[in-house]
Design a protein with these regions (language model features):
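Membrane translocator/pore-forming domains, dominated by Gram-negative outer-membrane beta-barrels
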Residues: 1-285
Length: 285
């Protein structure tokens, strides 16, 4: 994301990076209650991210790498008659970070948490086109241990932020059942192959307004010299306009590929601004 005013004035510095993770989840309960489908389960995830951070003048200052492991639980509720749904997610994460710049390394561990409540109501525009208004509330926090490198000490403290997202999702709703292919026959496995045009595919766009508030978290640093301590208070409070778009295709009965890309534009405060993209591979068993 872009720099919004400079870190010395409390803004988040400009950065760019990438991440990858593996997630394994399983349903623990599936039932029907009062006309609703209820599903509850747990998941675990492990991932790695690498982020390049820039100074106020645009020069590269260093790289932050994070190895993270997460455990979480989810609850999904669907009203069978109307299609109204709600997702509740709670997650805890353990972080192991390394910051590197100018032959100076800094290592720190920490803990993060996240809670999310999301709801939506789908409306059929045509037989295979769905418009779904959505509303989501997210509360997340991070606590990092204090650390020290060759330049001095750093005290991170505790940080947290809350987000409200309001928008809608417009997309196709084709049957994702992996039917009988006609393009050729896989004689080794005795199953039909599928050409690209035969694959079940859904596409969607999702414009949203995201409001970030109650963003807090101070960071102080200094040396053994008296009076050298400085405190920074990066803020993400503000409003962003966000646009996401994606495609998903079922390439096997239990295998789905997806791609997603988006852009967020800050319209007030120090909210996030920048591009994002991701590719996913979803396997069920």
């Amino acid at each position: 994301h872009d720099n919004n005013g400079g870190i010395a004035r409390g803004a988040t510095p400009e950065s760019s990076g990438s991440y990858g993770f593996v997630r394994l989840e399983g349903d623990l309960m599936r039932t029907e209650v009062a006309g609703m489908s209820v599903t509850a389960g747990v998941y675990g995830a492990a991932g790695h991210s690498s982020v390049d951070v820039k100074d106020d003048d645009g020069s590269r200052t260093g790289t932050v790498r994070d190895d993270a492991g997460s455990l979480g639980g989810y609850l999904n509720l669907i009203h069978n008659a109307s299609g109204l749904w709600a997702d509740i997610v709670a997650q805890g994460t353990r972080h192991s970070m390394k910051a590197s710049s100018d032959n100076n390394d800094f290592r720190v561990r920490g803990r993060g948490w996240l809670g999310s409540l999301e709801t939506g109501l789908p409306f059929s525009i045509t037989d295979n086109l769905i418009l779904e208004p959505q509303l989501q509330y997210t509360w997340q926090g991070l606590s990092l241990d204090d650390g020290q490198d060759n330049a001095g000490y750093v005290k991170f403290g505790h940080g947290s932020a809350q987000h409200v997202r309001a928008g809608f999702r417009l997309g196709s709703h084709n049957d994702m059942t992996f039917g009988e292919g006609t393009s050729s026959r896989d004689t080794l496995r005795g199953r039909a192959k599928h050409s690209v045009r035969e694959l079940p595919v859904n596409g969607w766009v999702q414009p949203s307004v995201i409001r970030t508030f109650s963003s807090r978290g101070d960071m102080s640093m200094g040396t053994a010299t008296a009076g050298s301590n400085m405190t920074f208070s990066p803020s993400r409070n503000g409003t962003s306009l966000d646009l996401q778009a994606g495609l998903e295709a079922r390439v096997r009965e239990n295998l789905t590929l997806g791609v997603q890309a988006g852009y967020a534009h800050s319209v007030s405060g120090s909210s996030a601004e920048g591009y994002n993209g991701q590719a996913t591979l979803n396997m069920t068993f």
